[in-house]
Amino acid sequence: MYLTRMELDTDRRSTRKLLTSRSRIHGMVEGAFSGGRERRLWRLDSLGGRLYILVLSEEKPNLEAAVREYGNLEEGFLTREYEPLLTRITDQSQWRFRLVANPTQSISRASTGKRGKVRACAGVVQQEDWLRKRAGKHGFMMEEGGFRVVGNDWHIFHKREEKDRSVSLREVSYEGVLTVTDVEKFKELLCRGMGRGRAYGMGLLTIMRLP
């Protein structure tokens, strides 16, 4: 697998237009690959006043066209193999993490007990609880108070094939420290992501080893 980073030039008109729609960004990401429609993860990250797009994929991407239209021409894009990171993951190892996700919940109907409509987790308490409940399933744990919500945003856009229907996604950013409890499950999480909206910039968890 490969992790790719490209700086977006927000001074360019084309880039500002791109950022108005998650569907447009999804199209740009898909255009960087020649293969079939594999699952790819991506997200936007702000760092030091600059905006980057991260892309995690099985196939090595070609973002040259994207750089010409939306990127920083001097920086281009950087692709690194993901396997060296995966081989460093061991049981009980600790990592700083950042996750951008779409936390949701399904409330059962009192009258029937059937699963109800899926809704975004509205408050920070619900959003933190969503991640806490899923940690074990994905092979990690977090100490109480060991993570926090650092960002909340809404994205409303139209899918290219469904222009008559809008899509609303709540984006929640988490940061903290985790401990790996199941190496294989955790590696799968890193490669496949978590939650809904993964085609539209959600679900990618990145880690950095604690000193």
Question: In which residue ranges do the predicted regions lie?
Answer:
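RNA-interacting cores
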Residues: M1-P211
